[in-house]
Amino acid sequence: MPTSVSLREDDPLLKDLSEKKQSFRRNVVSLATELKEARTRLAEQERSCSKEAMSRQEAETRVKRMEDEMHELAKELNEKVEQIRASDVATEKFVKELADIKSQLAATHATAEASALSAESAHSHCRVLSKQLHERTGSLKEHEDQVTRLGEQLENLRKELRVRESSQKQLRDELLKVEGDIMRAVSVVKTKENSEVRNMLNEDTPKNSERINKLLTAKDDEIARLRDELKIISAHWRFKTKELEDQVENQRRIDQELKKKVLKLEFCLRETRIQTRKLQKMGERNDVAIQELKEQLAAKKQHEADHSSNQNLWDKSGFKIVVSMSMLILVAFSRR
């Protein structure tokens, strides 16, 4: 053994061969190591390829799912846009109705104010008419009192006339009695044919006749004067009575007209109050409707704000860029 070793050491060929053999062994070991490493790398590449294939499949699945989600989101977005448009149309309609209701309410308030003014003017007119009616009633009462006094005066004149007629009748009765006495005395004188008595009677008869005639003339004059006064008073009374009757008739007609006006004004006042109550109720209902519309509009605005906040996430440029980059990366992986 030592001899062979020494031979190898002495022989350069053997030495070179030995070195080449060792180098070959080292190369074989290094090649085996490289082969092992290559196999390891190949296995790793296979695993990475399988992982890439799986990731590509997952990416494709994700892309498909994202496309479906984006399609659904676009569909929901279109539906939300349609809902928002419908809500805008409804809002415009509500706003228009609200403007109409406000205009109607303003017209109602104007009508109520005009009705209140007309009612106030009707009240003042009623007060004026009542005052005039009271004054006319007072003047009518005064005229009635005056007519009553004139009637009493006329009745007193009639009583006085009746008393004077009765006194005239008594005077005529006395005159007839005196004439009867005279006639009886004359007949007695004729029967007795007493000339002295006849002469005395002839002397006394003219005196008595003259006195009686004077008395009768005075009474007749007084009766004529009383009759003239009675005629004048009767004519004046008839004139006053006719004038008062005309005034009473005019007053009654005016009173009837005033009563009609008062009734008409009361009716207008009742109608005005009824219309005012109706307008107040309409105003209250309009206020309630306006409040409900405001609440509905506020709720719709809040709902639209919530939806817009949810939709703004999809409308943001950063989110769009991230989605675009993700899709590009997935497409690049799928191409590999």
Swiss-Prot record:
Localization annotation: Nucleus inner membrane; Nucleus, Nucleoplasm
Subunit structure comment from the entry: Forms homomers and heteromers with NEAP1 and NEAP2. Interacts with SUN1 and SUN2.
PANTHER family found in the cross-reference section: NUCLEAR ENVELOPE-ASSOCIATED PROTEIN 1, NUCLEAR ENVELOPE-ASSOCIATED PROTEIN 3
Source organism of the structure: Arabidopsis thaliana
Name of protein: Nuclear envelope-associated protein 3
GO cellular component: nuclear envelope; nuclear inner membrane; nucleoplasm
Main localisation: nucleus
Phenotype of gene-disrupted mutants: Double mutants NEAP1-NEAP3 display reduced primary root growth, and altered nuclear morphology and chromatin structure.
Aminoacyl-tRNA synthetase as UniProt keyword: no
Organism placement in taxonomy: Eukaryota, Viridiplantae, Streptophyta, Embryophyta, Tracheophyta
Record keyword Transmembrane present: yes
Motif (Bipartite nuclear localization signal): 240-261
Topology of the protein relative to the lipid bilayer: Single-pass membrane protein
Keywords from the UniProt entry: Coiled coil, Membrane, Nucleus, Transmembrane, Transmembrane helix
Coiled coil: 14-87, 128-261
Transmembrane parts of this sequence: 313-330
